[in-house]
Each structure stands twice: as C-alpha cells, then as structure tokens.
Amino acid sequence: MKQLSDLKNVGKATLADLRILNIYTVEELADQDPTVLFHELERRTQTKQDPCVWDVFAAIVHEASTGEATNWWSWTEKRKNLQKKGKFQHII
C-alpha cells in the first residue's frame, strides 16, 4: 500500500500540511478537492499560502485518485485559469 510520502510531490512540508488537514492516507487524499484543501489550510493556519500549494495539492490528489504521477507545475496553468475566472482566491 502506498504511503503519502511515496507520492511524487509529497515532501516534508506537504506532509506537514496534510497532517494539519487530518489527511493521513492516500485513500483519504484521493477523494479531496485541491481548492477545498487549500482554503482549509489557510483557515486552519490563519496564513496566506503560496498559490503553488494549490498546484501541489492538485498533483497529489490526481496521483492518489488515478495513480498517475505528474509534476506539480503542470497544474499551474489550470490554477491560473481558475484565478482568472474568480473560482480560486485566498480566504485570508
């Protein structure tokens, strides 16, 4: 069984963020929405997160749900499109 730390884009910082979000398994991560995770992390930490955190969340949720590992930066364009449409913004 794959551990969170086995996912391509999960390092120490992301693993710590996932713990803050009470996500401890790949199975728990697979059903998540990257935007919800990003907003919840900002809410729980009361800190404005770097938008690239969303990119990492998108990449790891994708890998957890499909098994396909992608580079986190391949999600940047999608996030920027969401930002332009007003569907992604900071809550802090």
Feature roles, as predicted:
Residues 1-8, 12-92:
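C-terminal extensions
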